[in-house]
Every structure is written in structure tokens, then in C-alpha cells.
Amino acid sequence: MSNGIKVKKRDGSIEPIDLDKMHVMVEAACEGLAGVSASQVEMKSGIQFYDGITTGEIQEILIRAASDLIDLEHPNYQFVAARLLLFSLRKSVYGTKEHPTLEGQILAAVAQKVYDHNIFDKYSLEEIHKVDTYIDHDRDLLFTYAGLRQVVDKYLVQDRSNGQVYETPQFMYIMIALTMFAEYPKETRLSYVKRYYDAISKHKINIPTPIMACLLYTSPSPRDATLSRMPSSA
């Protein structure tokens, strides 16, 4: 459904606003959660549509609306807001709801000069393909809004000058695991990668900021140096 108003998409194209599409997105964010309502989110948003409003602005308004509904009696709105943020993030990073393969993600990020190409020196393509089977993007749904917002704002690889993000949480987690165990024996390291990825992506353990954030230390063993400096770096 459209009321004649035009919206500006992320790629710069202009098209009529699709209120039905927006409703479907909010319904998807509420799916399976008790005590939440898509109509409440839409009413809370109080969106004033105007010609030229961007799809990103619409999504941010909906995210804020859902987060404003979080209270002691309706805690599940924290997951509605998180899902809306996740939908926006995936669309911004990939231009679609579908994720690339791990190899595709690494190649794209290397081309954008935000990942180091030496990951292909450390791991064979066969290993990369094997690790790809470990990734479960549905674990993004475990995030609360506060948790996902912190990850997006602080830890995902991004260009701080313009806010462009280059990865989603599960790729962040698997890249941390791959980097942590790159120097381990090839016979056993993938088992460590999987176990560590499972632990952090299921939020069974929290990663200290020195490992989550980007650091540049001069040391023969960057991983050990990072761990040893945690008290002074945190």
C-alpha cells in the first residue's frame, strides 16, 4: 500500500512508500515473542512521512519506538528492537537479508581493506569452507537491544568517519576465533575455533574489550600480549 509519498532507498533510488512492507517487517520482529504488538510499535513510532524520507530513517524511527516500549511489564520489546536493528544492519551491510559465505565475506572485506588478506595465508580454502559450516546466523536473535546496539556501535568493523559497517555479529565472532587460533597446530585448531565460536556466539562467555576491539601491539605473540595486558588496557 502507498499513499503517494516517495522514499529514498539505501542505493539512492526513489520509489513509492510501501506501508505493507513496513508492517511485515515489524510483524517479523515481533514473531514468537510474548507480550508485544506490531501495531503498538507502529503507533509509538508516530512517523510523519514526507517525500524523500530514507528507508534508513524509517527503520531508525521504528527501532526507537520499540526500545521506548521496553519496561518491566513488557521486557520482550528489547528483542523486537534488537531484531529491527538487525534487519537494518543486514540490509546496510549486504543490501539483502541473505548472508554471503564466509569466503565471500572475507573476500569482500579484504577488497574494502578492512580485513587482512593474510587470513588466506593462515588458513586453506578447505578450512575456511569447513569453518563456514560452524556459523549460525540465527544466534544474532539472542541479542537484546542494548547488547546488539553496543556491538554495532563499538565492535563491528566499520569506517568511523561515515558509520559504514562491514560485518554482522556472527562474522565478527568467527573472525575473532579464527584469529585467536591461527597459530595452533593445523590438526586440532578447527576444533578450538568451533568451541570458542560456539561459546562466544551463544553468549556463554563475554569477551573482554581488548580482544573485541582493535589493538595494535608490537609483540612476538600478539594474542598472548593482548591477554597479558588486559588489566592495563581495559
Where are the model-predicted features located?
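Extended catalytic cores of very large enzyme megasubunits
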Residues: 1-219, 223
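Positively charged, low-complexity/disordered segments
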Residues: 221-224, 228-234
